[in-house]
């Protein structure tokens, strides 16, 4: 983990998406949030950056455990609760934390995140071309 700002300020935990290290939250962004009165914490979730890593396809953990790790970060900094800002998978994890540990979450900010609720029936469907594009990622070699 890495922190920016004064620990006495409002804490915000930055949760990045899948296969992305905490440094994808730029230092300048973190510093600006800190200058605005936030205590900023970013961390590498499992299999990213400086955290524990496993052989591709051999990860012995679940998405729920990744969400529990967010609470471990909150605990590790001695905080009662924190604002959560999640990008992509990080947003999904932030939602799980809010559902499982509502008293530990001051607010949620989600960027490009999947939803945990049922879809709104009035929303238009995804264009099939978008689905096809993202399905091609299944065949990519992500090991490098």
Residue ranges and their predicted role:
Residues 64-82:
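Conserved acidic catalytic loop of the alpha/beta-hydrolase fold
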Residues 41-43, 87, 111:
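The conserved SAM/SAH-binding core of class I Rossmann-like methyltransferase domains
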Residues 20, 91, 115-116:
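Active-site micro-motifs of SAM-dependent methyltransferase domains
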Residues 11, 39, 80-83, 104-107:
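Structural signature of beta-strand start/N-cap positions in the alpha/beta core
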Residues 2-53, 59:
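Conserved HGGG/HGGXW glycine-rich cap/lid loop of the alpha/beta-hydrolase fold
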Residues 106-142:
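Flexible "cap/lid" loop of the alpha/beta hydrolase fold
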Residues 16, 82, 86-88:
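Conserved alpha/beta-hydrolase "nucleophile elbow" surrounding the catalytic nucleophile
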Residues 91-102, 108:
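Short glycine-enriched nucleophile-adjacent loop
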């Amino acid at each position: 983990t890495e922190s920016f700002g004064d620990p006495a300020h409002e804490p915000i935990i930055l949760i990045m998406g899948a296969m992305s290290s905490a440094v994808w939250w730029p230092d300048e962004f973190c510093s600006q949030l800190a200058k605005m009165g936030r205590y900023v914490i970013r961390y590498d979730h499992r299999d990213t950056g400086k955290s524990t890593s496993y052989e591709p396809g051999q990860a012995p953990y679940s998405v729920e455990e990744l969400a529990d790790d967010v609470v471990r970060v909150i605990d590790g900094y001695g905080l009662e609760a924190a604002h959560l800002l999640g990008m992509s998978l990080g947003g999904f994890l932030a939602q799980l934390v809010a559902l499982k540990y509502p008293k530990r979450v001051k607010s949620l900010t989600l960027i490009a995140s999947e939803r945990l609720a049922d879809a709104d029936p009035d929303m238009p469907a995804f264009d099939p071309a978008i689905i096809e594009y993202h399905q091609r990622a299944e065949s990519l070699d992500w090991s490098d």
